[in-house]
């Protein structure tokens, strides 16, 4: 669903383990890594979309995870001009996202799979909480930063995690 301003409603998923690491997934056919995310279908709530995307993209059911937090507001990013499809209506100029922080206990890691529906990822790894800031494609970076900063207080294990300064992409373990 694209709103009147041209932003597609979307959910993002930060899936953390009990050590505070997050699932980082590699897109099929690309050397591009990101958090799982996906559009909200007509009639769906953001929560419904998050659980659907969790199943479609990662193979996990709600029973495998604990919901820790959700961003308060929609976080928006604009697509670079080369990614805007000018021949489509309504015109989508970016995404507005609700971000969800989920916890996955180690025994449920065995349920992670990328063979449901139309797979979008072909590999994954656990990375430190702030690692994605230095790796995600540039136009998503500020949304990732805002989501990670807002949600970090809800992580069960925060020892040693430090919120980076605005321009600092160094990793802190």
UniProtKB/Swiss-Prot annotation:
Which cofactors are named for this entry?
a divalent metal cation
Q: Which InterPro entries match?
A: Nudix_hydrolase, NUDIX_hydrolase-like_dom_sf, NUDIX_hydrolase_CS, NUDIX_hydrolase_dom, RppH
Kindly indicate where the leader peptide sits in this chain.
none
State the Pfam families in the record: NUDIX
User: What are the GO MF terms of this UniProt record?
Assistant: pyrophosphatase activity
Q: Which UniProt keywords apply?
A: Hydrolase
NCBIfam families, per database record: PRK00714.1-1, PRK00714.1-4, PRK00714.1-5
This chain's function reads: Accelerates the degradation of transcripts by removing pyrophosphate from the 5'-end of triphosphorylated RNA, leading to a more labile monophosphorylated state that can stimulate subsequent ribonuclease cleavage.
Indicate what this protein is called per its UniProt record: RNA pyrophosphohydrolase
């Amino acid at each position: 669903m694209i709103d009147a301003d041209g932003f597609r409603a979307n959910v993002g998923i930060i899936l953390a383990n009990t050590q505070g690491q997050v699932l980082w997934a590699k897109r099929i056919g690309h050397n591009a890594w990101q958090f799982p995310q996906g559009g909200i279908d007509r009639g769906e709530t953001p929560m419904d979309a998050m659980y659907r995307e969790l199943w479609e993209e990662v193979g996990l059911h709600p029973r495998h995870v604990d919901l820790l937090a959700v961003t308060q507001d929609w976080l928006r990013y604009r697509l670079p001009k080369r990614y805007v499809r000018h021949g489509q209506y309504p015109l989508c100029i970016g995404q507005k996202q609700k971000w969800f922080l989920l916890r996955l206990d180690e025994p449920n890691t065995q349920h992670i799979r990328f063979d449901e529906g139309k797979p979008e990822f072909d590999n994954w790894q656990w990375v430190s909480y702030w690692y994605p800031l230095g790796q995600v494609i540039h136009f998503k970076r500020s949304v990732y930063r805002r989501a990670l900063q807002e949600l970090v207080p809800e992580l069960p294990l925060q020892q040693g995690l430090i919120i980076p300064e605005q321009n600092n992409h160094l990793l802190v373990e």
